[in-house]
């Protein structure tokens, strides 16, 4: 069994198209090296106004908002999501995230490991 708190892991910058995204960090809480063969659990922090630009890939996301208010787009759909909400992002659809609140957004994001 592994137990860990996010603050026990150093935050890493998030890279997008060869550059770091300002105001966004990630902490890999649970990953393959921990014995998790099917899913990874990640902890994101988005500072006020920070944006994870539109992107897409072949895996889904399962997200839980721990703090803050975030505008999430998936394809042509936009939703404002707040603390205590779960979100499912479908695979192969463009999606993005923007902190539109007055505080930092904290969110858990699970992704599957795809068989290659």
Please report, for each region that a protein language model flagged, where it lies by residue.
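A short, N-terminal "cap"/entry segment at the start of jelly-roll beta-barrel domains
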Residues: 1-38
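Anionic, Ser/Thr-rich low-complexity intrinsically disordered regions
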Residues: 40-41, 108
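Conserved short histidine dyad/triad with adjacent acidic residue
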Residues: 42-57, 91
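Short beta-strand segments in beta-sandwich/barrel cores
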Residues: 50-52, 68-73
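Glycine- and acidic-residue-biased ligand/ion/polar-headgroup-sensing regions
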Residues: 59-61, 65-70
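Short acidic-glycine-tyrosine-enriched beta hairpin
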Residues: 77-91
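Ligand-binding loop in jelly-roll beta-barrel domains
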Residues: 91-116
